[in-house]
């Protein structure tokens, strides 16, 4: 048993030793294999790194060679430029040297000529002195006395020429000033165009049928009395078909009455209480419209900083008229004319436009009727803090106060231009038509006249004469005779141009 155990132990020990030896052998084999693989891989990595380093070296070498070549090229270019500059400098030095030699030659020549000139000058001085002595001996005057007489003579001649020259300049200035003034006025008129509005002292209110007249009159006339009392307008209800006449000198009252009537007729309820309510409402609307019109006018003209009361007065101009010309349109037209004319004269166009717009504000208020409208307007402008030159332009535009501002004559002229424009102001229609008829009939009384036409609001009369009755020479004498007769027998504004027309027409037909 012991032997078996010993044998087993011996076998176990021998097996362990063999296993250890075998393990060592296998481990060494693996170690050798791994080492060999590592050496092989290291050799590959080494070769790759060497190739990579070599490639970088070659690239760097190529870059350096390019840079060196580029630098060499730049150096070569710089050397070429330097050589060119050296050549230019060399040429300039040669040119300078050549010019220096030429200048020295010219200097020597001038010095030689200067010597000759000095000699000739001495000779001339001697000759002049001799001539002066001879002249003094002949005339019996010294040189100083002769100079004084010559100077006096030249002074008188210069004075005469200067006076003549001054007179010529003054005549030319007068002619030029006249032409320039006409040009400025014409240009101002051409650049300003406004509509002409005609207002009357009555307003016609149209109705759909005459039945409405009875409702407006009311029982025993109470409605019409209430309407007249509320508006201050005379309401004329007569036999005129489908029309009621509103009569009042105050256009604002007429407008209030017209609008109130329109609302009452449209609404259908017409009785004293309703009339008072509608008139009160319309009066507020008209007042708002007046202020809105004033603001819109100042904005359109580019005028700022006006007192609210002045804006209200400007708005009321819409309902005022002067000789049939709407006052607001006249003020706007005058303002634009003033701005254009002031610009042409080198003055402030904004101030001129402001003065032109405000020049007739004295026609609007009803208070102080004893004052002329220009002075009342100046008083209002001063009250509402307008500048002195604008106040003076307002007050002096009808020569009722002294003109101290340059704007005053401009406003005066533009006011006259706006009022005198043909068609701007309305005469009484009957008188206007009668004057035109009288003009035409006056010319028709002459023998040989076949037709007459009064045009341009009666400022031009065209006379057509028969070609077989009057020759060309007689047309001139005829126009003169008609002009003289108009002057002697008629009253008219401005001037009337008479144009006599004589023509012969030959008409044939081609068939």
Swiss-Prot record:
InterPro entries recorded: HD/PDEase_dom, HD_domain, HDIG_dom, KH_dom, KH_dom_type_1, KH_dom_type_1_sf, Ribonuclease_Y, RNase_Y_N
EC number of the protein: 3.1.-.-
Transmembrane segments: 2-22
SMART domains, per database record: HDc (SM00471), KH (SM00322)
Every KH domain range: 201-261
A Pfam family reported for this protein in Swiss-Prot or TrEMBL: RNase_Y_N
Function: Endoribonuclease that initiates mRNA decay.
Name assigned to this protein: Ribonuclease Y
The species this protein was found in: Bacteroides thetaiotaomicron (strain ATCC 29148 / DSM 2079 / JCM 5827 / CCUG 10774 / NCTC 10582 / VPI-5482 / E50)
């Amino acid at each position: 048993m012991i032997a078996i155990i010993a044998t087993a132990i011996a076998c176990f020990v021998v097996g362990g030793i063999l296993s250890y030896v075998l393990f060592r052998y296998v481990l060494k084999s693996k170690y050798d294999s791994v080492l060999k693989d590592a050496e092989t891989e290291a050799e590959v990595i080494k070769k790759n790194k060497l190739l990579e380093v070599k490639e970088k070296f070659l690239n760097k070498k190529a870059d350096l060679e390019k840079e060196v070549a580029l630098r060499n090229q730049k150096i070569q270019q710089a050397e070429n430029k330097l050589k060119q500059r050296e050549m230019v400098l060399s040429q300039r030095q040669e040119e300078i040297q050549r010019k220096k030699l030429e200048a020295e030659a010219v200097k020597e020549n001038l010095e030689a000529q200067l010597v000759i000139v000095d000699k000739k000058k001495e000779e001339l001085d001697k000759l002049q002195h001799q001539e002066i002595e001879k002249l003094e001996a002949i005339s019996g005057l010294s040189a100083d006395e002769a100079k004084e007489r010559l100077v006096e003579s030249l002074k008188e001649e210069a004075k005469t020429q200067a006076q003549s020259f001054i007179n010529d300049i003054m005549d030319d200035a007068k002619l030029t000033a006249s032409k320039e003034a006409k040009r400025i006025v014409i240009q101002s008129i051409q650049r300003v165009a406004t509509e002409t509005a005609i207002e009357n002292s009555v307003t016609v209110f149209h109705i759909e049928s005459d039945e409405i007249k009875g409702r407006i009159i009311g029982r025993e006339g109470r409605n019409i009395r209430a309407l007249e009392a509320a508006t201050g307008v005379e309401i004329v209800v007569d036999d005129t078909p489908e029309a009621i006449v509103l009569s009042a000198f105050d256009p604002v009252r007429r407008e209030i009455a017209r609008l109130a009537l329109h609302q009452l007729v449209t609404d259908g309820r017409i009785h004293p209480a309703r009339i008072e309510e509608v008139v009160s409402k319309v009066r507020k609307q008209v007042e708002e419209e007046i202020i809105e019109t004033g603001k819109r006018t100042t904005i359109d003209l580019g005028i700022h900083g006006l007192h609210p009361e002045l804006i209200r007065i400007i708005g009321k101009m819409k309902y005022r008229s002067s000789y049939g010309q709407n006052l607001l349109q006249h003020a706007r037209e005058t303002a634009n004319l003033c701005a254009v004319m002031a610009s042409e004269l080198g003055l402030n166009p904004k101030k001129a436009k402001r003065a032109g717009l405000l020049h007739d504000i004295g026609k609007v208020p009803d208070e102080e009727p004893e004052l002329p409208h220009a002075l009342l307007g100046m008083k209002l402008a001063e009250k509402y803090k307008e500048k002195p030159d604008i106040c003076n332009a307002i007050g002096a535009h009808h020569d009722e106060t002294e003109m101290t501002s340059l704007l005053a004559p401009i406003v005066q002229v533009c006011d006259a231009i706006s009022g005198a424009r043909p068609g701007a102001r309305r005469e009484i229609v009957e008188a206007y038509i009668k004057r035109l008829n009288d003009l035409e009939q006056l010319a028709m009384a002459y023998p040989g006249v076949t037709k007459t036409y009064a045009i341009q609001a009666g400022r031009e009369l065209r006379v057509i004469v028969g070609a077989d009755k009057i020759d060309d020479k007689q047309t001139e004498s005829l126009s003169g005779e008609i002009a003289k007769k108009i002057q002697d027998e008629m009253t008219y504004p401005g001037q009337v141009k008479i144009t006599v027309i004589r023509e012969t027409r030959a008409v044939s037909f081609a068939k």
